[in-house]
Amino acid sequence: MNFQFLAIFSVRLATKEEVLDRTQESGDVNVVWVFTYNSNREFSVFEFILINFLFLLSIFVTFIGVFCIGKSNIPHRNARWIIISGMLLWLELVVSRSFVFIFQWSSDGLQSRSGLLFWAALLRYHYMFFGVHTLLCITAERAMATILLKDYETRPRVWIAAILIGANFLISLTYAFLAVFQQILMKSIFIVCLAVAVVSIILLEIIYFLNRKRLDSLIRHDNTMVLYTLSIKYQLQENVRSCRLMRPAVVVVGAFIIMLILAECLPIILDFSDEVQMWCNLIFDTTVHTDPLVVVPTVVALMESFRKVFLSYYRTLQHKIRPNTVAVIRRKSIFPFTKPKETEGDIYFEMFNKSVSPNSLAVKK
């Protein structure tokens, strides 16, 4: 196969000794070297079948989550678009893993195959940074809902979601290029992801506190406030409810992403045996590429509006597959009844004909 169009850029295939030497010299870890080392190993048929099965299951779960979020009315449309973008960008990992499989199966030259790993690493780290910054985008959207309090719900303002998603895509792509070109190492990546997750959680708490404080003040003094309107009260209630629902999801997703970053490099830094590293890499790689099995159920379960949509459609589907049938229980009668004969209907019909015959009418006259 010819992959020259992918070999514009390439990455160096590092060995375990090189990764450890670089770690001891600089006190930091080159994540791209770790990625190429893990990708340049032998893989089993079991691993191939397992990951592809989990990929199909993850795609199914992802589209269920997107459907539930799209059908929900809470939170605002812009927040739902941001969450959906974070879920759908997971498809980059499917492409990334496909490049790794082609690299492991291909018999082409080293240059063309290393080009495949470059694009695989770029897509992998772009998704990772995009997922982390999605937490900050959700917080920024709630901040805009707090600033534009008077008419945020009545106007779509799709440009807010478009700007946040576009900025997230470009910033994450910049970080991914820096990581692949070895301009930022493991410590820098970890600091960026941790800082973004912590800042998102803190800002979301501040936004929740401000909206909650203003809503309480509005409820206590609604008769005396001159600028009191029902739309402002509704928007404050919406902001408080959305922030309350998003807080646990942001914490869980942020902790999960940071855990994945650490799990990639720790087995090599701690110098585990090759067999242990192989199993650690299999578990980590499978978890990364099938994270919708963790993230999507977490978001749907922790956010009440998404959970209600899912349960509603689940009950509807269950009713269509297995409709509820009311069992009719007939008790045995205490009166003996004989079974009707086959000619019983004919006898009654003849009696009726005789009763309306012309002779019977003449007698009555």
Curated annotation (Swiss-Prot):
GO biological process, alphabetically ordered: sensory perception of chemical stimulus
Lipid bilayer topology: Multi-pass membrane protein
Keywords per UniProt: Membrane, Transmembrane, Transmembrane helix
This protein's GO CC annotations: membrane
Main location: membrane
InterPro entries the UniProt entry points to: 7TM_GPCR_serpentine_rcpt_Sre (IPR004151)
Positions of transmembrane segments: 49-69, 82-102, 116-136, 158-178, 189-209, 250-270, 292-314
Subcellular location as annotated: Membrane
Annotated S-S bridges: none
Keyword match Transmembrane helix: yes
UniProt xrefs under Pfam families: Sre
Similarity remark: Belongs to the nematode receptor-like protein sre family.
Name of the protein in its database record: Serpentine receptor class epsilon-21
Gene source species: Caenorhabditis elegans
Taxonomy of the source species: Eukaryota, Metazoa, Ecdysozoa, Nematoda, Chromadorea
Gene that encodes the chain: sre-21
